[in-house]
Amino acid sequence: MRDNTQHYRELFLDDIPLMDVRAPVEYHKGAFPNTVNRPLMNDIERQKVGTSYKQHGQQAAIALGHELVCGALKAERLAAWKAFAEANPNGYLYCFRGGLRSQIVQQWLKQDAGIDYPRVIGGYKALRNFLFETTRAAVDECDFVLVGGLTGCGKTEVIAALDNSLDLEGHANHRGSSFGRRATPQPAQIDFENRLAIDILKKRHRGVGQFVLEDEGRIVGSCSLPLELYQGMQSYPLVWLEDAFEQRVERILRDYVIDLRSEFERVVGVEEGFAAFSAYLQKSLAGIVKRLGGERYQRLAAILVQALEEQGRDGSVDTHRGWIEGLLKEYYDPMYAFQRQSKEDRVEFRGNQAEVIGYLRQRQALRPS
């Protein structure tokens, strides 16, 4: 039998499969990549056992748990655990603290299925704390540089081109602006933090000591950046990405109109997808009505409605450029210009996409190992 493990680092570096035996309500609040939920108890059973524990103590709670999970129900759950163990012979199981629930699953697997399957000592809480410390240590020990620039200048493309970048928007599944929602949901806050920490862990394991981030606010959609990282971002050096206005319009048209329509249609089907995509754009514009002002909003909203009608009718996207240009000139560019004033003393390089990528690669190469 393989031993129970406290080698949290190796679990994440090697993408070891994990079986989470917590209740679904716990799992959906936050888990880890390469994890599946095969609960010992469902949400209602867990609630009953928890109440029993508070009122009558541990032994009564354990007895109730065995009473609730027995017979055909126990056999069904045991079959799910057995299937996971056989499909993932290098995996581990865990509960919240690595205590009774994971030990009971281990015992039942051994007694009823003849399978010795190891658990993660300390469970979910220990794994979570390890990842929290991974992010904190990186902020303390590594160098960071931010990529800034006007809306649509291609910051995401720079992040994708570098092997020492951390894609905050990718981990959050959100583009970070009022129009940043994707066709699929954002992860839970804890899942976002865990994904980011594992990315940091793997890159540091490869020898990365200098990370490139996009200059973001504290909130990316519904996901909040780790506080210590966000605080550091208020003083990190900044590289400013520049691009022509026309190119920025075309990039936004591609990302937020052409590609995003396709994304919605892949997820929910062609007809419903276009309707959802149209509603998303109009809702996003309405979300900044107070900042735009009533007259400006009405004008841009009318252009957007016309653009969507034309796109739905014959696929034309030309009219979309009208509201995109208006938003850039009248809203986003002035806002970014104002924000940039407070960051000007941190800008160490300016250039187009190729120049910025080249500079950041050279910056990484020159960093002492």
Curated annotation (Swiss-Prot):
Keyword Transferase: yes
Domain annotation Rhodanese: ranges: 12-136
Disulfide bonds: none
Record InterPro entries: P-loop_NTPase (IPR027417), Rhodanese-like_dom (IPR001763), Rhodanese-like_dom_sf (IPR036873), SelU (IPR017582)
List of catalytic residues: 95
Molecular-function annotations in GO: transferase activity, transferring alkyl or aryl (other than methyl) groups; tRNA 2-selenouridine synthase activity
Enzyme Commission identifier(s): 2.9.1.3
Oligomer status and interactors: Monomer.
Known role: Involved in the post-transcriptional modification of the uridine at the wobble position (U34) of tRNA(Lys), tRNA(Glu) and tRNA(Gln). Catalyzes the conversion of 2-thiouridine (S2U-RNA) to 2-selenouridine (Se2U-RNA). Acts in a two-step process involving geranylation of 2-thiouridine (S2U) to S-geranyl-2-thiouridine (geS2U) and subsequent selenation of the latter derivative to 2-selenouridine (Se2U) in the tRNA chain.
Protein name per its UniProtKB record: tRNA 2-selenouridine synthase
Originating organism: Pseudomonas aeruginosa (strain LESB58)
UniProt gene name: selU
